[in-house]
Amino acid sequence: MKYLSKFFAFALLAAGASVIAHGQAQIPSQPQVKVDADKGITGFESFQGTVNSDSRIFKIDSNLGWDFNKHFGVFAGVPVYFANLPSTTTTTGATTAATGSTTNSGIGNVYLGFIVKAPSPKLDYAGAVTVSAPTGSTSKGFSTGRAGVDWTNRFERSFDRLTPFFEGGLSNTVPDSAFLTRPFTSLGAVSHLEEGAEYQLAKHFYAGGSGYQVVPFGSQKVFSKLDGKGKGKNPFDSAAVSTGNDLTRENGFNTWVAFEPASIWRLELGYTRSMTFDLSSFAFNLRMNVGKLLRSKRNY
C-alpha cells in the first residue's frame, strides 16, 4: 500500500504540473499571426484506472506525435501498468487464513502508428492503425510476447449539445479503451465495438454512456495481470495463462460524468459493468493534451 500511495502522489503531481503550466501561459492583448493549428506536434498524457472488488488496474500512457495537416498524423508511445490485488481473509471452520496484497508493475508494449482524419459538419471520421512491439513482461501479463496490430475507426456527429458516436475495429489483442483498463492481455483476432453518446450538461460539464462488445475469432490466449490470483471465476482470475475460443468474448456498458475546465485537460469519472465477466467497477481517466499546450505557446 505504501507503493500505491507513492504511485498516486506521482500521478497527481504530474497532473498538477500540467495544469499549472497551462495557467501560466499568457494571453496576448493584441492579435498574433496564427500558426497553422492543423500542423505540428501532438502529445497526450493520460492516467486511467479500473477499480473493483477483484483488483485495481492503473495505467499511465504517454505518447508524442506529429500532425502533417488536418487529415494525417503519426504518433508513438508507451504505457506503464500498475496491477494490485487487495489483501483477503478466508475463514474455514475455526481456521482463518490471510493473504497479503500483491502488486505487479512495469511497462507495456511500445507502440507507434498513424491516424487519418476527415472532419465534417455532417459526420466526423478518424481512423488509426497502431502497431506494438512486445516490450512488456509476459509473466506479469503486460504483453503476449508477440507484436500487436490494431485498426480502429470512429464516427461522431454533434447535434447541439448531444454527440452520438460509434467506434469499431479489428485487432489481434483486446485493447484498453479510454474508460476500461483490462486485467489481462490477449493474443488472438478480435473485433471490438462501442456505441454511445455524450451530452453537455453545462459549460465544462458532460455526461455520457456507451455499450461495448468484444467478439473473438478463433483461439484466444489470455495473459493475466493478476497472476491468476484473482477472487473471481474468470479465466484471468484463476490462471496466469489460459487458452480457449471464447475467453475474450465480452459485452457491457459504461456511464460517466466529465469535467473539462480547460481545453488541455479533462477528467472522467464513472461506472463500468462487464455483463460477461460479472464485474462492476469504478473507472476514471485524467487526460492532458500536452501537444495543444505546446502549440498554443508557439502562437505567442
What are these regions (language model features)?
Residues 87-100, 192, 196-300:
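Outer membrane beta-barrel transmembrane domains
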Residues 47-51, 78-84, 118, 131-137, ...:
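Transmembrane beta-strands of outer-membrane beta-barrel pores
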Residues 29-45, 70-72, 121-125, 160-166, ...:
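Outer-envelope beta-barrel architecture signal
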Residues 43-45, 76, 114, 127-129, ...:
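Membrane-embedded beta-strand positions of outer-membrane beta-barrel proteins
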Residues 56-60, 101-110, 143-149, 185-193, ...:
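Residues that define the transmembrane beta-barrel architecture of outer-membrane proteins
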Residues 40, 144-238:
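Detector for outer-membrane/organellar transmembrane beta-barrel domains
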Residues 55-60, 86-94, 127, 137-145, ...:
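Outer-membrane beta-barrel translocator domains and adjoining extracellular loop/strand segments
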Residues 21-54, 156, 226, 244, ...:
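Outer-membrane beta-barrel biogenesis signature
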